[in-house]
From Swiss-Prot:
Modified residues (Phosphothreonine): T511
GO molecular function list: aminoacylase activity; antioxidant activity; catalase activity; enzyme binding; heme binding; identical protein binding; metal ion binding; NADP binding
Protein name listed in UniProt: Catalase
Assembly, per entry: Homotetramer. Interacts (via microbody targeting signal) with PEX5, monomeric form interacts with PEX5, leading to its translocation into peroxisomes.
Class in the EC hierarchy, top level: oxidoreductase
Region span, Disordered: 1-34
Recorded superkingdom: Eukaryota
Keyword hit for Phosphoprotein: yes
Gene: Cat
Length: 527
């Protein structure tokens, strides 16, 4: 019944009711000129041609032609919300960041949840990691914690990131999702085993956005007021409890309600059922990092909680839906290099790569002045620098202040207290190969100790159901990697693949050639 619809379905009705006492606004052009007729174009006679002087039409159509901005190359499908972060435990011994200044302090936040590989209109219930990015609007500028719903990732070296994403996207010729591409990359990069195993476990399809954890994933550095530093990892655990979707239910929702996660989040907040997450850190001293049994900056591994327990810090609460999706979610831009004093990057190779990649793609997608867009603006800090001009400069461009540094005219000065913590690095400069670092020990622990028997069974079924569509030689490479983790892991997946492979094969298209250039060259030669 229409009377029992959810808040998302009734958005238009509620908007009208909120404006009930007001008269409708006067319809205008983009330039603010009142419009007398919005239904009929201006023509020379009832059957004549359109007149170029019909600026009502040209203003509308020209803007419509430019409505779309470039889609995010990853994390294109997403949902956003706003709220606050509240400190519940003192960690000033670790960090001088103002966001952690005292117990009870609240900092405004913006959060975006997303899938990774799908396009903007893709389903929310696919098996894919979820982005879980948090923007803290602090007095020292924005802090963007650009995380996922998994504590690990597929790769540990940023050089592989473009190829990894290409393998998860569409085939360059068929424009279809291609299991050959997906599993060829994963099987050739065994460092992906930890994340692949997590992805095909029950947690690979969260029940919406409210029932999953978030992780900063990378290793970061915290610096206190005395200049003392430690390494840390960030965790945010859902207070709603972990809930995942069975494969069949996820498939049904993908067809019947592909925006399931977006709808669930909007309706929960609109109904006053504000989702929250408890925020924790793990801490490791520099001395501990030197003797750690593996690289503490390796994004494919976790820090054991028994050795580095979770330290409670605060709570994330989401209590406001976006007023306009495009303005506040599609234009939202997260940048891992946005770190206020007290929070710094570690040598994590993936984090180091993201420090460049994220602001670079935002400048492409939103323009060089994307930080002036209201949702991205560090509105609780006063931005004062020597950056000027550029497309879509929306403020006063810092008026008549000098645009060079140093200068003698009382323009912005550097602040010594904001200097980064000193770091020590190896003097050896080369491309260090990390591909053969231990890729199986933590995966074995996850498989044998974290998952129970039923969960292991579903894991192997999920993998085989996806891997079966790849070519046999790729299947064999993948199974070898699973066997390296644990013989039972590989044997179960292989047994299921044998069942699939014994059935009549489906028609498959495998087109990995560079024929186009050869054909073109041959054609030119025959001219």
């Amino acid at each position: 019944m229409a009377d029992s619809r959810d808040p998302a379905s009734d958005q238009m009705k509620q908007w009208k009711e909120q404006r009930a006492p007001q008269k409708p606004d006067v319809l205008t052009t983009g330039g603010g000129n009142p419009i007398g007729d919005k239904l009929n174009i201006m023509t020379a006679g009832p059957r004549g041609p359109l007149l170029v002087q019909d600026v009502v039409f040209t203003d509308e159509m020209a803007h419509f032609d430019r409505e779309r901005i470039p889609e995010r190359v990853v994390h294109a499908k997403g949902a956003g919300a706003f709220g606050y972060f509240e400190v519940t435990h003192d960690i000033t011994r670790y960090s001088k960041a103002k966001v952690f200044e005292h117990i009870g302090k609240r900092t405004p936040i913006a959060v975006r949840f997303s899938t990774v590989a799908g396009e903007s209109g893709s389903a929310d219930t696919v098996r894919d990691p979820r982005g879980f990015a948090v923007k803290f609007y602090t007095e020292d500028g924005n802090w963007d914690l650009v995380g996922n719903n998994t504590p690990i990732f597929f790769i540990r070296d940023a050089m592989l990131f473009p190829s990894f994403i290409h393998s998860q996207k569409r085939n360059p010729q068929t424009h279809l999702k291609d299991p050959d591409m997906v599993w060829d990359f994963w099987s050739l990069c065994p460092e992906s085993l930890h994340q692949v195993t997590f992805l095909f476990s029950d947690r690979g399809i969260p029940d919406g956005h409210r029932h999953m954890n978030g992780y900063g994933s990378h290793t970061f550095k915290l610096v206190n007021a005395n200049g003392e530093a430690v390494y840390c990892k960030f965790h945010y655990k859902t207070d709603q409890g972990i809930k995942n979707l069975p494969v069949e239910e996820a498939g049904r929702l993908a067809q019947e309600d592909p925006d399931y996660g977006l709808r669930d989040l909007f309706n929960a907040i609109a109904s006053g059922n504000y989702p929250s997450w408890t925020f924790y850190i793990q801490v490791m001293t520099f001395k501990e990092a030197e003797t750690f049994p593996f690289n503490p900056f390796d994004l494919t591994k976790v820090w054991p909680h028994k050795d580095y327990p979770l330290i409670p810090v605060g709570k994330l609460v989401l209590n406001r839906n976006p007023a306009n999706y495009f303005a506040e979610v599609e234009q939202m831009a997260f940048d891992p290099s946005n770190m206020p004093p007290g929070i710094e990057p570690s040598p994590d190779k993936m984090l180091q790569g993201r420090l460049f990649a994220y602001p670079d793609t935002h400048r492409h997608r939103l323009g060089p002045n994307y930080l002036q867009i209201p949702v991205n603006c560090p509105y609780r800090a006063r931005v004062a620098n020597y950056q000027r001009d550029g497309p879509m400069c929306m403020h006063d461009n810092q008026g008549g202040a000098p645009n060079y540094y140093p200068n003698s005219f009382s323009a912005p000065e550097q602040q010594g207290s904001a200097l980064e913590h000193h770091s020590q690095c190896s003097a050896d400069v080369k491309r260090f190969n990390s591909a053969n670092e231990d890729n199986v020990t933590q995966v074995r622990t996850f498989y044998t100790k974290v998952l129970n028997e039923e969960e292991r069974k579903r894991l192997c079924e999920n993998i085989a159901n996806h891997l079966k569509d790849a070519q046999l030689f790729i299947q064999r490479k993948a199974v070898k990697n699973f066997t390296d983790v644990h013989p039972d892991y590989g044997a179960r997946v292989q047994a299921l693949l044998d069942q699939y492979n014994s059935q009549k094969p489906k028609n498959a298209i495998h087109t990995y050639v560079q024929a186009g250039s050869h054909i073109a060259a041959k054609g030119k030669a025959n001219l």
